[in-house]
Each structure stands twice: as structure tokens, then as C-alpha cells.
Amino acid sequence: MEDPLSIAVRFALYTDLMMLFGLALFGLYSLRGAERRSGAVLPFRPLLSATALIGLLLSVVSIVLMAKAMSGASEWLEAVPHAEMMVTQTELGTAWLIRMAALVGAAVTIAFNLRVPMASLLMVSLLGGVALATLAWTGHGAMDEGSRRFWHFSADILHLWSSGGWFGALVAFALMLRPNKVETLQSVQVLSRTLSGFERAGAVIVAFIVLSGVVNYLFIVGPQVSGVVESTYGVLLLGKLALFGLMVGLASANRFVLSPAFERAVHRGEYARAARSIRYSMALELGAAVLVLGLIAWLGTLSPEMEAGM
């Protein structure tokens, strides 16, 4: 089994960068005007600053861990020279440098959110998207060559972006649904509008996740299912698909049942119970998303071909 610490760092990095990208993107397509200013609806500045800085720290730990594993070094300090060599002499190192630059840029840009909220969120979403895309170089696509490599990377990056968009929206709704945030009519109206507005964006995101996920499966495993479920990779993949199905089911319940009920309750001025129902549903969906990210981090360290040959 892969080093649990490496899997944990991968999981933390996936979660952090998806939150950075997805939360900034949510502010662009769901909020309006002054609502994009930190503190008006969501705490953009402290939250995105923290995720950018944590992303920098996790990236440093990640590259040293990879160098330690590849070099066979027994001590952390012994792995540092190997990490420096990886950064300066490999494609993975180039992707890592791009990620670090993007995260520094995001940390600087979000500081201007109170002055230029829309521009700052736009820049953070772009830089966060670049940082998130670099994780593709730590996945299975890095082992391909030629045109296959290009298309595998494209599918990987699309999967990362669409997953980040969904995860960021879930985090945003979780923050907006906190009990102290649904006390005023204005905040409840913003919540109702963003829930309704996310219906179309959510459908597009799910479509991209399914499309890119199928393409990734074909690149990694091929057009077959027999034998895959007998491996650790297959079991984890089935778990991921089951959790994804649960998330789609909860999202459908939110769209077709809970959100319309909440909107009607807002018009009547009786929204406490409806908000509580959506809060529980979103908490389950966010919890499932976190588990999915954990499985993604683990799956990225496994090779179904190698397991099949064992």
C-alpha cells in the first residue's frame, strides 16, 4: 500500500486547491455586485488567503515526499537535494513551479477584494484553476506519451476543474446555510436566489464530471470491467461511484424538492424549517464530496495494470 502520509497530503492538496478555485468561481457566477465583496455574503478574503497559503505549504511537503519516495532516502533532509533536482530538471517540477507562482498570485490578488471584488475573484479563479490543473501531472496521465498524453491530460484537467466547481459551491452553500446566516430576510433571499441559480451550473458541472470521468477510465483501464473490481483500484473506484451517485441524488432532491420549498417558504416569511432541511442535505452532500476526494487521492497512487499483474 502507498504511504498513508503521501495519500493524506494528496487529499489535503486536492481539497485545498478545489476550494480555492471553486469558491472564487462561485462568487463570480452566483453573486452580484457588492455581494462579491468579502464579508457581504461569504468571507472571501480570509478564506481564500488561507487556502492559497496552505496550498503553498502542502505543495512543498508534497514535492519533498515524492523526492523521498523516488530516491529511497530514509530522512527528510536527505530528500531535499532530490526535490531540488525534481523541481529544476523534470516536467513535474515545472508544473510545481507554475502552481507555486499561481498560488502566490492568488494570495496577493485576493487582498484587493474589498476594492475590486469582481476583478479579484476573477483573477483568483483563473490562478486557482491553473494551480488545480497542475495536479494532473501527479496522476496517471503523466505516464502517457504523444497525442494520448495530451488527451489524457485534457480529460484530467477537465475532471479537476468540474469537481472543483462542485466542491467550491458546496462549501459556499455550507457557509451560507450556517444558522447565524439565515436570520435576516436579505441573506435568505440571496441564499434562495443562488440555490435556484445553481441548478443550471450544477447540471453542466455534473455532465462534465461524468464525461471526463468516463474518458479517464478508458485511458487508465480501457473498455473493460471484468477483473477490475477484483483489485484495490476497482473497489475504491466502485466506492467513489457510489458516493458520486449519492451526491447526484442529494443534488436532485435539493433542486426539485428542497430548493422550491425553501423559495416558497421565503415568500411566506417562514424559512427556518426549510433552511434546516437544506442544511442537512448539503452537509451530507459535502461529507460525501470529502470522501470522494479522499478516494481520488488514493486512486491516483494505484495502477490497475500493476495490480492485475500481481
From Swiss-Prot:
TM helices/strands, residue ranges: 11-31, 47-67, 92-112, 116-136, 157-177, 201-221, 233-253, 282-302
Query: Which keywords appear in this protein's UniProt record, sorted alphabetically?
Result: Cell inner membrane, Cell membrane, Copper, Membrane, Plasmid, Transmembrane, Transmembrane helix
Biological process (GO) annotations?
copper ion transport
Matching Pfam families:
CopD
According to its record, how does it sit in the membrane?
Answer: Multi-pass membrane protein
InterPro entries registered for this protein in UniProt: CopC/D, CopD, Cu-R_CopD_dom
Q: Which GO terms describe its cellular component?
A: plasma membrane
Look up the domain of life of the source: Bacteria
Entry's localization field: Cell inner membrane
Induction behaviour: By copper.
UniProt record similarity statement = Belongs to the CopD family.
Please give the PANTHER family that the UniProt record associates with this protein. INNER MEMBRANE PROTEIN YEBZ
Function, please? Exact function not known. Involved in copper resistance. Appears to be involved in copper uptake in conjunction with CopC.
By what name is this protein known? Copper resistance protein D
